[in-house]
Amino acid sequence: MEQQISSLELNQTSSQAATDTNLDCSLAGYDYQLPPELIAQNPVVPRDSSRLLVVNSQNTGNETPPLHHIFHDLPDILRPGDLLIMNNTKVIPARLYGRKSSGAEVEILLLEERKFNCWLALVKPGKRFKKGTKIIFSGGKLGIRNWGLGIEEEENNRLPITHYPLPSTHLTATVLETDAATGGRLLEFDLPEGQSLVQLLDKFGEIPLPPYITASQAADEQYQTVYAEQPGAIAAPTAGLHFTPELLDKLRDRDINQAHVTLHVGVGTFRPVEVENVTSHQMHEEWIEVPSATVEQIRATKAAGGRIIAVGTTVVRALEGAAQSGELQAFCGKTNLFIYPGYQWRVVEGLITNFHLPRSSLLMLVSALIGRKQLLDIYQEAIAAQYRFYSFGDAMLILPKE
């Protein structure tokens, strides 16, 4: 009888393990219901007054319950000798408003510079952006609507461009081709020789916020980390938004060190996984740089017994992407690394991250570190405790297992 019971328990355990493995590979396994009111529309002030849910990494069978903290408690939670790796990318004013040669108002979102002053961009409305189409940009949405004010418009703003006196300050771009991969357009900007578009975006562009932020009063600088240095992202590495200069100083005083990588966050961050078997998902490419100084700091930290804590999923992708040869190396280029449960970690041991969208590649990445079922259980606790979700929301800290 004892052997029969043991065999039955073994079969049940094996069956449960098989079910969990199947769900790890299934898109449905990463779904959860979030009350809309928990989607943060504005950041907290000060930044480090956000809440912090602290959990231990990966299923050991005796996980301690999550601990509820405030983000400014971080120096008391981490250990001296730990190393925080941060993404120093800077969000560019990548959303521009303009008029086509027909007079129709248009909106574009810059994605990446393919060559000097030639940018891949998403366009809206997208159906009639044919090769050779000219676009005039002037001073954001308000500027483009004021342009031509007083001219009697017909057919929903479709007067020829010649009916509108050109504003004194404007940009011109020409559609070169359609990009099959994104559905966007390659635009060539007509600028004075030696001048780059990035230098002019503060004048003509606006900081793009994620589509789920619909009622924000946040200032542009609140969607930048305090250590942002390298322009190129179209979305912020949001785990870093919780840090203040004072908190960074306090961490240094506790011998909790900091190093930087760069990953320019792209539009793929907001694109859902659409294949039912997540192992078939093709990850978008993003540009990363892992400098040699950061590699040396990581090696020294590990040698001294310190822990490597990534600040955000973008740092995870940068570090792990630079270690795909088996060992972390200085790297500058693109990565399309997709991390999901079963991934063999090479560099990262702990993670600070916000709460992510259902069925997203970011949720799968975090599941690879902590386990999908444990992560969804933690999310349910966070929802019950009224944590704020997504870009302007609260954070969680996943500590390395002992």
Question: Residue spans of the language-model regions?
Answer:
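Arg/Gly-rich low-complexity intrinsically disordered repeat tracts
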Residues: 141-153, 157-168
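Surface-exposed, charge/polar-rich loops and edge strands
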Residues: 2-140, 167-402
